[in-house]
């Protein structure tokens, strides 16, 4: 089957939810038996988001092959079964870097290197490579139509639609249709102007997704269709909903997938959305609720922990409970004390970098351990739990990580200095190495101890999880820590690195070096998060007695 492309753009304002809308459409097409993948093209100059501040950009989503990507790829994986890879996300910076490298090598044979055709050709090549082997590819263009940064991408997809034939390309434009309370009606003019901007670039949208806080009336959709030169049945109303998992059904009810399949001449079965209906039912009919405190340093922007937040919700679905997440700044724990952690049913410390707020996280881990509160530590959350145990149980005064105190007496967490690249070559890295692209990244095998709590949750002694870190447990001090009672519940496939720790005399204290949140989905959940939320429910019941 020839690969078909749906190019997704956004207009009027940012943060309309292009990623969610595109992923929801992909879920419907997948439910019709099509092999679907998605791509995100980001117009910023950074080569990837790996070194960008989470407060500015949100979380960095790590793929199985170790790419540091936009958080939208997390949405994609939560909505469709296809696993994303480094082919599914690239930036302006990556494109320019590749083109300039070719220019330095002389690949362009002395030609003047320009945005058109060299940059646009590079973009097209990456899109085609990312879509190979799939029936339908949804390509989301970051930013808003009208932004200078997006122009090379828009020109590239305009050209690509011509190259592959318009019978295999659709342009879907997401736009805002605001409701004006004073007039008592929605306004279509912003949408008309946004489409006009697209037309000036040479792109005629085939589908318009109209975002609004309410359903856009049929007469207004007809008006939009007339003035934007779009088929009336291709003007879709996408109102605000209380659950993003209702969006696939909302789009399907308006015949969006039928319209697309007809345009692409795809003779496929009707979509079966029963799995999504089950998710919606579980979300709407909880048997209880728990409150979980998440102690971090980027809490002013919840998107910095997007996958963790979603994974906690998925854990709630698997236990039929609503998970109320209380975001707590770790610096507040330092200044106000652990009293602010009271009345929580469980505590989670997610990943992070840098010393700010670390002592608050260490105090949090101690509070959870000493008060038998369920604890899940992820990445840095495992490292602070280890530091706390070393200080207060083993007796290693001022134990720390060399990330925070390079010359500390007890460096229980230290930099991994020898790494193997994707070709198997040994590469030495130090504190002076570049920050970008120099971490242990992607899916890594882990051997789980038979007698561990984690073994019961996973149901297996061999698991694979995604990583993003450059510091690890210092094996030189491990014997003393184990002798004091800490259980090493999981190690890397080569038995060299500690992956999971547990406190055996605690009802539920688990910490892992990997990031389980990246593989959690609403339909399948994740063993660790399901077990963690279950432990929170059980703790709540014990406290109520």
UniProtKB/Swiss-Prot annotation:
ATP binds at residues 15-20, 72, 239-241. NCBIfam families: PRK05380.1, PyrG. L-glutamine binds at residues 352, 380-383, 403, 470. Pathway: Pyrimidine metabolism; CTP biosynthesis via de novo pathway; CTP from UDP: step 2/2. It catalyses: UTP + L-glutamine + ATP + H2O = CTP + L-glutamate + ADP + phosphate + 2 H(+); L-glutamine + H2O = L-glutamate + NH4(+); UTP + NH4(+) + ATP = CTP + ADP + phosphate + 2 H(+). Coiled coil: none annotated. Mg(2+) binds at residues 72, 140. One of its GO terms (biological process) is pyrimidine nucleobase biosynthetic process. The active site is at 379 (nucleophile), 515, 517. GO terms for cellular component: cytosol. Transmembrane segments: none annotated. Its EC number is 6.3.4.2. This is CTP synthase. GO terms for molecular function: ATP binding; CTP synthase activity; glutaminase activity; identical protein binding; metal ion binding. It is an enzyme of class 6 (ligase). Residues 291-542 form the Glutamine amidotransferase type-1 domain. It comes from the Bacteria. Allosterically activated by GTP, when glutamine is the substrate; GTP has no effect on the reaction when ammonia is the substrate. The allosteric effector GTP functions by stabilizing the protein conformation that binds the tetrahedral intermediate(s) formed during glutamine hydrolysis. Inhibited by the product CTP, via allosteric rather than competitive inhibition. Residues 1-266 are annotated as: Amidoligase domain. Keywords: ATP-binding, Glutamine amidotransferase, Ligase, Magnesium, Metal-binding, Nucleotide-binding, Pyrimidine biosynthesis. It holds the Pfam family GATase. Catalyzes the ATP-dependent amination of UTP to CTP with either L-glutamine or ammonia as the source of nitrogen. Regulates intracellular CTP levels through interactions with the four ribonucleotide triphosphates. Belongs to the CTP synthase family. CTPSs have evolved a hybrid strategy for distinguishing between UTP and CTP. The overlapping regions of the product feedback inhibitory and substrate sites recognize a common feature in both compounds, the triphosphate moiety. To differentiate isosteric substrate and product pyrimidine rings, an additional pocket far from the expected kinase/ligase catalytic site, specifically recognizes the cytosine and ribose portions of the product inhibitor.
